[in-house]
């Protein structure tokens, strides 16, 4: 062999332990697999680099009703925009006594609020909730408020 410095691995070929001691040394998973020992022999590492990894916080609420106040709202001034301009013009042209039915729940709204003004035209509005103002304005225009479940 040339006088290039030998690497350690080449030197250790042919020796059983290859520089790792006697029986059972340098084998398999001496510290356990994965996150094993986080509460025990790897405690220092977990406390230093992953604080709060173990344990519970706070209390659970078994009967929590997350969406019980979910109530998408729309104002009166936007009410006819749900029907559409062409439908509104068609109703104006006919001058019929038929009142269109607007079901707010189908459009994804639950509550009707009273901001804005309504055209002096009867309309039947179905919703889960009405504000007092909205109800008064609809009745003033000759319409009806229907509560839907």
Swiss-Prot record:
Superkingdom, natural source: Eukaryota
InterPro entries for the chain: Ribosomal_uL15 (IPR030878), Ribosomal_uL15/eL18 (IPR021131), Ribosomal_uL15/eL18_sf (IPR036227), Ribosomal_uL15_CS (IPR001196)
Coiled coil stretches, renumbered: none
Gene3D superfamilies recorded: 3.100.10.10
Keywords in alphabetical order: Ribonucleoprotein, Ribosomal protein
Stretches that traverse the bilayer: none
GO molecular function, one term: structural constituent of ribosome
Annotated region (Disordered), positions in chain: 1-37
Family: Belongs to the universal ribosomal protein uL15 family.
PANTHER family registered for this protein in UniProt: 60S RIBOSOMAL PROTEIN L27A (PTHR11721), LARGE RIBOSOMAL SUBUNIT PROTEIN UL15 (PTHR11721:SF3)
Protein name: Large ribosomal subunit protein uL15
Organism, as annotated: Drosophila melanogaster
Gene that specifies this protein: RpL27A
């Amino acid at each position: 062999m040339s006088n290039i410095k030998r690497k350690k691995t080449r030197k250790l070929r042919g020796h059983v332990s290859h520089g790792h001691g006697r029986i059972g040394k340098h084998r398999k998973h001496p510290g356990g697999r994965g996150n094993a020992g986080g509460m025990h022999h790897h405690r220092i590492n977990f406390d230093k680099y992953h604080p709060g990894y173990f344990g519970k916080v706070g209390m659970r609420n078994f009967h929590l009703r997350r969406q019980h106040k979910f109530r998408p709202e729309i104002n009166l001034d936007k009410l006819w925009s749900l029907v559409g301009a062409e439908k509104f013009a068609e109703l104006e042209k006919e001058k019929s006594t038929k009142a269109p039915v607007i079901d707010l729940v189908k459009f994804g709204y639950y509550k009707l609020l009273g901001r804005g003004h309504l055209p002096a035209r009867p309309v039947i509005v179905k919703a889960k909730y009405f504000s007092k103002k909205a109800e008064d304005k609809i009745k003033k225009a000759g319409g009806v408020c229907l509560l839907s479940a």
